[in-house]
Amino acid sequence: NPASLLMDMLNIGREAAYRRLRGEVPFTFGEASALCARMHFSLDRVVGLAATDKLSFQLKFKEFTAPLETYNEILERDIAFMREVASDPTTEFATATNSLPAEFYGKYDNLNRFKLFKWLYQHEVGNPAVRTFEELKLPAELQRNCREYVRWVQSVATTYLIFDDSNFKHWLNALRAYREMHLISQESVRVLRDELFAMLDEMETVAVKGEFENGNKIFLYLSDIDLESSYSYVTTSRHQAVNIGMFSLNGLRTPDPLMYEYVKKWIKTQSR
């Protein structure tokens, strides 16, 4: 119901919502901006100001002064978004990636911690006193949100995941390199190895069954062609968006319909 949608998003009464729908009362700029943000469409395109040869992307990370806190805030926004789209039975989420996705490793505490340690080390950000993997302690809230994100991603009705053969190779190469630099102990390597095997068993199970533990559908594919980055899209009955991965945990996002169609087509071709 459009009126109910406006009432919920704009916090207005039913009669006020119907007056806006009938054109009797114009939307304020603030109301229009709020609708754009919630429904993921471009206000520039609505009013005809958008240049047809330019696209707008939003970078997930802009500040690195408090990286773990920033990452936790982004996780909370992602959880809220996935919770919203998971309520739509038509929602489709797809990823083509050359690295193991958070949709799987996020529920494994040590794998998740190693991914964040690698990211902090590569960008030379975070606490300079944290010199080794063992010294990195993740806040309990961040660990909880990582697992919560996995839960809500797997709550989407249909998921497509496409990997190339470098997924595990990237993790093994990083483990080997950090071990040689004495940034991680042999015992931690064994713990991470065990979690990698557990995750592989989980992936094999869902691949055979074609569904997560909650019964939602998942289709896993292996690409014979190397994937140069990570690409994903989400589509529901109301909106759509894409994400292009960069800098390990960062990404460029846009709800642009042309880019959505391009990324969706590209991902679909990788599953052939």
Each model region followed by its residue ranges:
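Hydrophobic protein-protein interaction segments
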Residues: 117-272
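Short, structured coil/loop segments at alpha-helix boundaries
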Residues: 9, 44-48, 65, 101, ...
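Glycine-rich loops and low-complexity Gly/Arg-rich segments
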Residues: 44, 82-84, 259-260
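Helix-turn-helix/homeodomain-like alpha-helical modules used for DNA recognition
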Residues: 52-131
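Short, charged low-complexity intrinsically disordered segments located at boundaries
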Residues: 18-20, 48-49, 63-69, 106-112, ...
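Charged/polar, solvent-exposed surface patches and flexible loops
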Residues: 4, 8, 19, 37, ...
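Basic, Lys/Arg-rich alpha-helical nucleic-acid-recognition elements, primarily the DNA-binding modules
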Residues: 1-58
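Exposed alpha-helical structural elements
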Residues: 5, 16, 66, 70, ...
